[in-house]
A protein has these predicted regions:
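Membrane-interface junctions at transmembrane-helix termini in multi-pass inner-membrane proteins
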Residues: 100-121
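Interfacial transmembrane-helix starts/ends
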Residues: 10, 45-59, 216, 220, ...
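Signature of the first transmembrane helix
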Residues: 1-29, 66, 70, 96, ...
Length: 363
């Protein structure tokens, strides 16, 4: 996609992440915590009932948020100053709904200390995201460049040069790549659903009105604080999106030549001024931030694995063992994160050149 295409791609992701965090972040934690507590107290029937209530409670929320992203997409892209990203934002909207379903199933399995379905679904999701995203983007690029070679309009626009054709294609290619992301969330959701419905279940998951209210209250009490915390963290990317592109465009309007001299390797002088802000944002978010998120992804898995054990110990009142477990998790997190963070700081250039050698302008 290059820096420009990544700008459109990451614009969609930066809008998607805080809304997805608001809808999804607390679901697996709440379901996992309640499931682990039920199993610790030998209430074997409760986990399926918790899952049923969670699905009934959270799926409408995911559907509403998906519809909200799709309908509000023109407003979002206008306030961030990147209106060409409209297609990418709308393409990622259904992913919120699929993520809600996946989050509930993952919480159910993680609460029972069965990480296999979660791991399988994440492998499926990552594989489909890579394959479908690349295939969709390549199909879009090859088709439209073929139209340019044949002298036909590119994406409905008549162009006179290859650079102009690539500029016109970039937002459509980014939207095509985002379709791969949405398809991958559907694939991960199906993997979890198949795992659940493919295993034997004993007992009934029927639940009365009183039980529905009881479980709903417990789920919301646990989920909402986690969702709020995740929203605050992810809002930083949305604030970046609103401020960075607009500030970069303002900097270009003030000192185009100085900006070109400060980044000679990026080839900014060959671009139109209105494209530079999106290109630089794509380089920042698509390359630098991608590397940055590797460390939190590793450490977050420690918390996911530890949560069922912590909830089980809390339910049994084992405070001493609970404290030792939390200290162990924090210790391992520091041991992993500190050297990785220092290494990334000291070798940032070499890491980017190694992983993105085909994108020297963006590096």
């Amino acid at each position: 996609l290059g820096g420009e295409g990544m700008g459109y791609y990451m614009t969609a992701y930066s809008i998607f992440n805080p809304i997805c965090a608001l809808c999804v972040a607390g679901f697996p934690v709440a379901v996992s915590r309640l499931t682990a507590a039920s199993l610790a107290n030998h209430r074997r029937e409760e986990p399926r009932r918790i899952l049923t209530v969670a699905l009934l409670l959270f799926l409408p929320m995911g559907l509403l948020c998906s519809a909200g992203i799709y309908l509000a997409a023109p407003f979002f892209v206008r306030i961030v100053g990147n209106e060409a990203a409209l297609g990418a934002v709308r393409a990622i909207a259904p992913a919120v709904f699929f993520c809600c379903i996946s989050a509930v199933f993952r919480g159910y399995y993680e609460g029972g200390r069965n990480m296999v379905p979660t791991a399988v679904s994440q492998v499926v999701e990552a594989s489909v995201k890579l394959g479908a995203g690349i295939l969709c983007a390549m199909h879009c690029l090859e088709t439209e460049l073929g139209h340019f070679t044949a002298g036909e309009p590119v994406c409905g626009v008549t162009v006179s040069s290859l650079e102009e054709a690539q500029m016109v294609i970039a937002p459509y290619a980014a939207a095509a790549a985002i379709i791969g992301v949405t398809v991958s969330t559907l694939a991960g959701c199906l993997a979890l659903a198949l795992a659940y419905f493919g295993e034997p279940h004993t007992g009934s998951d029927r639940i009365g009105a009183a039980g529905m209210i009881h479980y709903s209250k417990n789920l919301l009490v646990t989920a909402l604080p986690v969702c709020a915390g995740a929203l605050v963290v992810n809002l930083s990317s949305f604030v970046d999106l609103m401020s960075v592109i607009n500030r970069l465009n303002y900097a270009v309007s003030l000192g185009w030549e100085a900006l070109c001299r400060s980044h000679p390797q990026a080839g900014l002088e060959r671009m139109e001024a209105e494209r530079v802000g999106n290109f630089l944002f794509g380089s920042y978010s698509g390359l630098a931030m991608t590397i940055f998120h590797l460390v939190p992804a590793i450490t977050a898995s420690l918390g996911v694995c530890a949560l069922p054990l912590i909830a089980s110990l809390a339910a049994r009142g084992s405070r001493a063992q609970l404290r030792r477990t939390v200290e162990s998790v924090l210790r391992i997190t520091v041991i992993v994160a500190l050297p990785l963070g220092l290494g990334m700081s000291c070798m940032a250039g070499q890491i980017l050149q190694l992983l993105f050698s085909s994108n020297p302008e963006e590096v």
